[in-house]
Amino acid sequence: MKLNEIRDNEGATKDRMRVGRGIGSGKGKTAGRGVKGQKARTGVAIKGFEGGQMPLHRRLPKRGFNNPGATDLNEVNVGRIQQAVDSGKLDPSAPVTVEALVAAGVVSRVRDGVKILGVGELTASLTFQVARASKSAVAAIEKAGGSVTQSLAATDGAVASA
């Protein structure tokens, strides 16, 4: 016996029932769907319809809103920036800007700017020009001998908000 000769025992598996293949098959004509009505048609389920009962999405109260004026900042940890410096993708002598982070592949598709967060180790002395930085990030950067300049105007084409 070879691998390509392996098969189930005779009668071990039944063929699946193919519906709508003539009345002689026993599952022809209505194909197990009964007679007429919405459930006999294709595309049966109307999403969110609960048979006339008030649907869940209308029973629950409306909450919150999406603020169109909110600043959407990309968050980057100092540990990730240190990785980019160690791998040679980020020049430690040049200031760390949005453009430099995008070029190094640390962030992509920057919206309103970059916020530096303090997770991870930073050993390189870097100068940052970013929209925002957390207190822990500023502490880590200054501990490593670097400096931080924060302003939303320093972002890529974004308008500073008051």
Swiss-Prot record:
Molecular function as annotated in GO: rRNA binding; structural constituent of ribosome
The alphabetical list of record keywords is: Ribonucleoprotein, Ribosomal protein, RNA-binding, rRNA-binding
Tell me which SUPFAM superfamilies the record gives.
Answer: Ribosomal proteins L15p and L18e
Skewed-composition ranges (Gly residues)? 21-35
Gene3D superfamilies for the chain: 3.100.10.10
- Is Ribosomal protein found in the keyword set? yes
GO biological process: what's one of them?
A: translation
Please list where the region (Disordered) is annotated.
Answer: 1-42
UniProt lists the family membership as follows: Belongs to the universal ribosomal protein uL15 family.
What the entry lists under HAMAP family is as follows: Ribosomal_uL15 (MF_01341)
Q: How does it assemble?
A: Part of the 50S ribosomal subunit.
Summary of the function given for this chain in its UniProt record: Binds to the 23S rRNA.
| Record's protein name | Large ribosomal subunit protein uL15
